[in-house]
Design a protein with these regions (language model features):
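Short aromatic-glycine-(Arg/Gly/Cys) micro-motifs in beta-strand/loop hairpins
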Residues: 8-23
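Flexible, active-site-adjacent loop/turn segments at secondary-structure boundaries
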Residues: 21-26, 46
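A short, exposed loop/beta-hairpin motif centered on an aromatic-Gly-Thr core
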Residues: 24-35
Length: 72
C-alpha cells in the first residue's frame, strides 16, 4: 500500500501543514516543504507501527498545494 500525504501551505500561519487519511494521527507543520517532508519521513513509520499497520520500507506519496494571488 502507498501512503498518501497531503501538504498544504497555510498562508495565515506561514507554514506547510501535512495530513494523511492513510496515516491516522499524522498532523505536522514546518516553515519549509523540505523540512516538512523530512518530519513526515521520521513520524510516518512510528505512527503506522502504533496503529498496527505498515511494513519496512514504507512507501509515501507526497502532494503539495499552495494558492497565491499575483498582480497583472
Amino acid at each position: 500500500m502507498e501512503y498518501r500525504v497531503k501538504a498544504i501551505w497555510d498562508d495565515d500561519a506561514h507554514v506547510w501543514v501535512a495530513t494523511s487519511e492513510d496515516i491516522p494521527g499524522l498532523t505536522l507543520e514546518s516553515g519549509s516543504l523540505d523540512a516538512l517532508i523530512e518530519r513526515v519521513r521520521m513520524a510516518a513509520p512510528e505512527l503506522l507501527q502504533l496503529n498496527g499497520s505498515g511494513s519496512d520500507p514504507v512507501p509515501l506519496c507526497f502532494t503539495s498545494e499552495r494558492h497565491e494571488w499575483v498582480a497583472i
